């Protein structure tokens, strides 16, 4: 059985490298995904990626995936999207939640997540490296 992981990135992450680099770092999303693709390939795992600023596109991708694991950075949808949470619960695919910044050290409204209580794990505050940690953990979960 081949292993597949879906990487889901929410709104404004397409601006990585330009948007508040002091908070989110200087790497672009393309840079991050390239690193993750290399990591996945070395582990013999397929990585599928979607980034969208539109909630319905993320939901449709989650509904359509045949992945066995999801890594999600819901971005601003973390604090607002019951629909995206319901999509994750509806497909019942285990997932890791990732945030580039330490959301708990930021504004109070960023402290609540609609996903954390259902995630296998939550990784925040490590910048782009957080995705690598999540991918390593997901691969370990899949391969036992």
From Swiss-Prot:
The active site is at 24 (proton acceptor), 99 (proton donor). The record marks 19 as: Transition state stabilizer. It catalyses: 3-dehydroquinate = 3-dehydroshikimate + H2O. CDD domains: DHQase_II. Coiled coil: none annotated. GO terms for biological process: amino acid biosynthetic process; aromatic amino acid family biosynthetic process; chorismate biosynthetic process; quinate catabolic process. Its EC number is 4.2.1.10. The keyword Acetylation does not apply. Pathway: Metabolic intermediate biosynthesis; chorismate biosynthesis; chorismate from D-erythrose 4-phosphate and phosphoenolpyruvate: step 3/7. The keyword Lyase applies. Substrate binds at residues 73, 79, 86, 100-101, 110. Catalyzes a trans-dehydration via an enolate intermediate. PANTHER family: CATABOLIC 3-DEHYDROQUINASE (PTHR21272:SF3). Belongs to the type-II 3-dehydroquinase family. This is 3-dehydroquinate dehydratase.
């Amino acid at each position: 059985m081949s292993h597949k992981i879906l990487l889901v990135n929410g709104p404004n992450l397409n601006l990585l490298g330009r948007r508040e680099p002091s908070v989110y770092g200087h790497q672009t999303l393309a840079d991050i995904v390239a690193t993750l693709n290399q990591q996945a390939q070395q582990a013999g795992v397929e990585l599928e990626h979607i980034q969208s600023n539109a909630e319905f596109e993320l939901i449709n991708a989650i509904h359509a995936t045949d992945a066995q694991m999801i890594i999600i950075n819901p971005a601003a949808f973390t604090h607002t999207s019951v629909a995206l949470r319901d999509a994750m619960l509806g497909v019942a695919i285990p997932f890791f939640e990732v945030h580039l910044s330490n959301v708990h050290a930021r504004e109070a409204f960023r402290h609540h997540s609609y996903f954390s209580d259902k995630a296998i794990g939550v990784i925040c505050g490590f910048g782009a490296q957080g995705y690598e940690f999540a991918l390593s953990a997901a691969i370990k979960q899949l391969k036992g």
